[in-house]
């Protein structure tokens, strides 16, 4: 699907640059400090329970958000449906697995480094820094950080 976050579906196909820019934009709109989670934040929010859309049950497509069981912290879709950007000491990565990931690989062990093939069919020249034409399995989760907002 190319819903890009509309109609209750996860926002997909965005590059790390686009995800970071969205967080900055949303921060200024809400006067809150919003960011992509660090890998440590993501791991703290991830528990081994809760539902997940994966290769064996997703029928080759993303699904509306919050349609599986939440984890014990009450957070939906931490694993599966779409992989999520996190920041690491080695740069941005995609974690959690997606609707294309086998069930046994869903979770924190599914950690991907972005590759050029995620944008191979982008018709723009130069290729877009904002979206990945071939990475409909990459999405975004945001973190609202405590403290004062700084532009």
Question: What residues fall within each predicted segment?
Answer:
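Short, structured beta-strand segments at or near domain termini in extracellular proteins/domains
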Residues: 136-150
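Functional-site microenvironments in short loops/helix caps that host divalent-cation chemistry
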Residues: 2-122, 134-136
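Short, P/G- and charge-enriched loop/turn segments at secondary-structure junctions
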Residues: 124-131
